[in-house]
Amino acid sequence: FNREKSIKRAESREKALDKIERIEKPIDEKTDMHITLEPEITSGNDVLSVKGLSKSYEHKLFSNIDFQIKRGEKVALIGNNGTGKTTILKIINGIVDADAGEIKLGSNVEIGYYDQEHQNLDPDKTLFDEIADAYPNLKATKIRNVLAAFLFTDDDVFKRIRDISGGERGRVSLAKLMLSNANFLILDEPTNHLDIMSKEILESAINSYTGTVLYVSHDRYFINKTAS
């Protein structure tokens, strides 16, 4: 009889604890990434002109490439691995020099660059400091809110870049991209390491974006959803 009473008391305590946990858990706890891409200023109608672009390393990557991009276009660079797509983005962004050719940016063009290797992140910095140093005018509360929108809450913001996963580094890079308010986004494999829901959220943000986008992706679904 006493044993049965003890079992009932234990079960009652478990139910009470379960009820407390359910009550204490925030109802609106964020489980999805939130990103809004908004250019601060409008560029001229002619955003990018590429003429006669060529590049070789041990072998020829590409030669005599010409293309133009107008304001508001969302352009995907597609092709086989090793054909120089990422190199084209780096040349446009001034990271790599071309062997030949001309790159001309239009008036009032401001570039926001997403690097698939996340080399723009300092591995020794915390997530908080990575944002704070890039945008020194942001208050601590704003930085925390931005990081929370990308699913970094509480003590997560004090983790070092070197200690987080590839997908998490991608979210930090996207947070910095969002804060740039650039009007010309250059994105190198932006969906790599993102979960399905985050990919869909990024798709929606790009489709709503009023600026111009040039990106490399192997994600056919993403390309079909976003490229103009």
PLM regions and their residue ranges:
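Extended, highly charged alpha-helical segments
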Residues: 1-34, 38, 99-100, 136-138, ...
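ABC ATP-binding cassette signature C-motif
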Residues: 35-228
